[in-house]
Amino acid sequence: MPTIVPFETLTELFINLAEKHKGKGKNQFYFKPTPNSDYQPIEWGQVSDDVYSLAAYLVDKGIEKGDRVGILSENRYEWAIVDLAIQLIGGINVSLYTTLPPSQSAYILQDSGVKVFFVSTGFQLKKAVEIFDDCPDVMEIIAFDEPKLEHLQEEEYVYMFEDILLEGGKVLEENRNKIKKLSQEVEPEDVCTLIYTSGTTGKPKGAMLTHKNIVSNVKAATQHIYWDHTDSLLSFLPLCHSFERTAGYYAMISSGVEIYYAESVDTVSKNMPEVRPTIMISVPRLFEKMYNLIVKSVEEGSDAKKAIFNWAVETGRKYSEGQRGLVTLQKKIADKLVFDKLKERTGGRVRLFVSGGAALPPEIDTFFQCAGMNILQGYGLTETSPVMAANKPGQEKVGAVGTVIPGVTVAIQSLQDAEILGKVSGEDYPTKLSTGEGEILCKGPNVMKGYWNNEKATKEMIDTDGWLHTGDVGKFDEGFLKITDRIKHMIVNAGGKNIYPGPIEDLLKTSKWIDQIVVVGEAQNFMAGIIVPDFEAVSKFAKDQGLKFENNEELIALDEVNDLYKKEIRSFSKELASHEKIRDFRLVPNEFTVETGEITPTLKVKRRVIADKYGHLIADIFSNDND
C-alpha cells in the first residue's frame, strides 16, 4: 500500500508521522520493561517528545548536520528514538553490532569519526569505556541502562540516557529554531547512515546510504508487498543490519505497522505467542532451525505420527499447487492435525514471513509453503539499501528470490566475457526473460553513494556505467531472479570444474543431524565437508545406543556416530552431480559462532577463518587422495 504520509527524506518521514498522529494516541512501539512483565505501548506523542528532547540535547552539545552519532545496542525503543533524533537534525547514524569485539568497534568509531556514542547495557558500556581513549573524536558515551559496576558511571564522559533526555527537555525551547533550521536543510542526496559491512575478509567498509537510497527502497517495498496499520511486527534482526533497518523499521512506521521488540534473539520463540505478530522478518537460519526441530520431532515419534505428517505435507503440496475439491477438505484436516500446531508457535496470526540476507534452501521453502506459511524471499545487499528483488504474496516461486522491485534494474553479466546476458527493471513486468548464469549487477536510486573514506573500494564495487557489482552469481528464470552463490566462494576442482558450495550446503543442512557445514575441495579430486553436528540430536542417538561420552569431542569420535554421518551424507549426495558429491567429512566439536570468529554478525560463514582453523582436518581428508 502507499505510505501513510508523503516524504522524500527520513527527516520528513518523522516530522510528518509525528504531525499525523499528534493527539490521536496511536501506538507505534512496544517493549518489555522487565522479562516477566507484559508488553508496554509507546504512543506517538511520547515518541515525538523524546525525539525532540534528544535532538535538543545533541544540538546543544554542538552536533551539526553531517556529524556522526554511534549506536551500540540491541533492538529496543531507545535505538529508534536516537535514530529519529539523528535524522531530524541531519546527522549520520553509525550503528554497530553488539557482537563485535572491542578492536573492531574501535576501528569503526575511528574510521567514521563518531562524536557521541550511545550504548545499551552495562556490558556494552564496559566495551565502550575500554576503547574510549583510542577514539579521539568521541566526546561522550551515553548508556541506556544504568550499569551495575558503579565505576563505569563515574567516568566523566559517561552519561545516563534518562538524565540527558531530561536535560534535552530543559534546553528544547532555546534550541527549537536550530532544530527546525537543521531539519529544513536535509536533502535527499545527503548521507543518513554509515552501515559497516561485517565482511568475511578484511576490515569493515562503511557503506554511505543517503536519504534517497533508503526512501526509494521503502516506497518500492511498500508497493511490492502489502502491509498496513492492522499489522504488527516482532523485531529481532539487528537494526544495524540494512534489511531490518529498511524493511523492519522505516517501511513499517511509514505504513502504520506497530513494532514489538523481542527481548533478545534468544527469546523470539517465547515472544512470538505473546505478541502474536502478523509479520515476521528474518534470515534463513531461523527457518532452518524451525524446520529441523519439526523434522526431529516427527522422526522421534511413532510410525503413525510419521505417516500423518507425511500425508499432511503431501496434502499441503497439492493444495499449494492449486488442487481443490476433496483436497480442500483434506487440507482442513491436515491443518487441524499438524499445521495449526506449528502456526500456534508463531502466535497463530502471521500472514507474512519475509526472508532475506541469504538464499533459503528450496526444501525448506517448499515445506513452509505446504504448511500454508508462505515465506517471501527477498534479495539485496547493504550497498543497495538493501532490497533489489522480492517475491510477492500469491506469486511466489520456490527457489527464487522474486521479481525486481519498482525503480530498480538488475542485470546478469557473463563471467567469461562481461557481456550483459539480460536485464530487467521493476517496470518491465510482466516478463518471461530467462538467462544463463552470471554476476548480478544493480542500478537504481537504491545504490549507495560509495564507501566512507574508501574511494578504491567504491570504484571496485560500482563501475563507470553506474552498475553495482554484487559479487553474487545468479540468473533470471522467466522473470524471477535466482541466486546460486558468491563468486568468491566458487571452488575449482582438480578437473577444472566450477563448483558452488552454497547449494550443496543448503541441501545438507536440511538433515536433522547437521547444524552447520562448510564444503571444501579447492584443486582436489572430490568435495568434502567440515560439519558441525546437531549436538542435541546426535547426543540423543548416542545415549539411545548406550554409548558413553563425556563431551562433544568424545561424542564425535565415536565410530557409531561417524557411521551415522557417512550414511546420511551418502543419502543426501544422491541428489548431487558426481563432481559435487561429498566423499569425506570431519565432525568438529563446537558450533561456528560470531564470538569465536567463524561467522559474521549477519550469520555468513567466514570460509577463510574455517579453512585456517580446521586446516589440519582438511589436510588430513585429502592427504590420502591418490586418485
Task: Name each model-derived stretch.
Residues 143, 159-162, 169-196, 203, ...:
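Conserved pre-ATP/AMP-binding loop-to-beta segment of ANL
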Residues 428-493:
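Conserved ATP-binding/catalytic segment of the ANL
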